[in-house]
Amino acid sequence: MTYANPHLLWSVDELKDHVQDPNLVLLDMRPPEAYSNEHIPSARSFDIFGISLIDTRPEPLEAFLWMMEHLIQGKGVNSDSNVVVYDDIAGMRSARLFWFLEFFGHDAVHILNGGFNAWRDAGFPITQQAMVPKGGNFKMKPRRERIATVDDVLEKLHRPSTVIVDARSDAEYTGQLVRAKHGGAIPGAVHLEWTNNLDSKGFFKSAAELKQMYAERDITPDKEVIPHCQGAYRSAHTYVALRLLGYPNVRNYLGSWGEWGNRGDLPIEHPSEP
């Protein structure tokens, strides 16, 4: 069984063949210190790990998306760029920017499967020379069907045609680890930690393994799927896994628990130990 959308992932061999393409924009999502120590030649450092939104009402959401558009432009991304994103493994940092770009209407985006570790382990060139890009002309064309807001989640609660996926850790899901004003879970959410998407070496699991894993939890392609975590990083990884499988209706909840758990007017449940 193969992925429904295999083009979303690039192998290190594919990247090696295209790394000098003039239209390629390679974005290193790791912390700046990791980038400065060693990175793939021509990669541009783009650490946005600390940038999140905990209020997805229309006005703050619009301002946040405008900021993200300008940050992406600043890394030299053009409307016709072929973008490849990576972190140490095929992880949540690269997944989140992948989701942003798809949401912004940019289809030419890929995740480096296995990440920087796979590139280095293959013996391919690495460098410490920083890439300083010129600004790009990237313009967002948001696809509303790729994002979920707090109002969307509220509207979809307990609908049999929608499944909310909690991609956080066991402790966060049960409320033992509280990273907001309130701990717990969105009522009815199905818990499946994002790390289950990966094998032991940091590559995405096979299509057959992913399909079985999600089907066993009744997360199926006929449903609208809304993943969330704390800040839409880990849930973006779930988004990518489901996109690889060809799920047609997946929407990442941008505010995630950082929004839901900090409000006092939203329903919360406290699941038992998984």
What name fits each language-model region?
Residues M1-P274:
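Cytosolic catalytic domains that perform sulfur/thiol-centered chemistry
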